[in-house]
Regions:
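Short intrinsically disordered, low-complexity coil segments enriched in acidic
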Residues: 2-3, 26
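N-terminal Sec-pathway targeting helices
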Residues: 3-19
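Bacterial N-terminal signal peptides
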Residues: 16-28
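A structural signal for short, hydrophobic/glycine-enriched beta-strand patches
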Residues: 31-205, 233, 237-244
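Accessory cap/linker subdomain of secreted extracellular hydrolases
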Residues: 193, 197-224
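Low-complexity, Gly/Ser/Thr/Pro-rich intrinsically disordered linker/tail segments
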Residues: 213-244
């Protein structure tokens, strides 16, 4: 009887140890995933306090419908305003072409930003990007061309988290500054009507009619940008070889 009880006890002990190890592994995996792929707004903002002011922040565009400022566009512009007015950013780069509507996203954002009080001399626009990876990469190149050294990517946590592996893979030097919702809720900002005519593309064809779903998904995942990065690296190698 004593032998049987000891055996049962050992089995239960092993089961508990196994369960504990499983929980530890799951927790470690979740923590690893969190650190690798999620841009925590609070942590990123605390980091920004140590590195501000950034020479420039990159703010990706979003489709605009005439006469309306949708919630996503509103949040991104308000966040840019908050960072600019509170000394976190010296300059702002708005990025985006006319992608899903006939209005050039970056130019619409610029007009709205000026309307709420951001100095136009500190606003730049990147007008080629049609996907998030392009928003980031093309604006990053523009920032470097303008001589900006410290750069941050300012958007929703979900979108910035999507860009975390991209940054790591191509060793781009910038910080993430995802929106801290509590900060923009407190802002008393109302968007007044703007003259949108300068941002309108008359012969506009939406992206969904220019690209298949497969091609569009590849663009979202950065296929076009990856090709451009590899081509740029190859060109530099050739130039260095010729110089030698």
């Amino acid at each position: 009887m004593k032998f049987l009880l000891n055996k049962i006890f050992n089995i239960l002990l092993i089961s508990k140890i196994g369960l504990l190890l499983t929980c530890i592994l799951l927790f470690s995996s979740c923590n690893l995933y969190y650190n690798l792929f999620y841009t925590d707004p609070t942590k990123c903002f605390d980091n920004a306090k140590c590195h501000k002011p950034y020479d420039a922040i990159i703010v990706p565009g979003f489709p605009h419908d005439s006469g309306k400022v949708n919630i996503v566009l509103s949040q991104r512009i308000k966040w840019a305003y908050y960072l600019y007015k509170n000394g976190y950013a010296k300059n702002i780069i708005f990025s985006g072409a006319a992608v899903h509507s006939p209005y050039i996203e970056s130019k619409i954002m610029r007009l709205l930003a000026i309307e709420i009080g951001i100095d136009d001399s500190h606003i730049y626009t990147e007008t080629k990007a049609e996907h998030t990876t392009e928003n980031l990469y093309y604006s990053y190149l523009l920032a470097k061309e303008l001589g900006f050294q410290s750069i941050a990517f300012a958007t929703e946590p979900a979108q910035s988290s999507f860009m975390k592996p991209f940054k790591r893979k191509f060793k781009l030097k910038f910080d993430f500054l995802p929106i801290v919702t509590d900060s923009i809720i407190k802002l008393n900002i109302k968007f007044n009507p703007i003259d949108e005519s300068s941002t309108f593309v008359s012969n506009f064809i939406p992206l969904k009619e220019r690209e298949s779903i497969t091609k569009s998904l590849r663009g979202t995942r950065g296929r076009k940008v990856k090709k451009e990065i590899h081509a740029s690296k190859l060109l530099k190698r050739k130039q260095n070889h010729i110089a030698k």
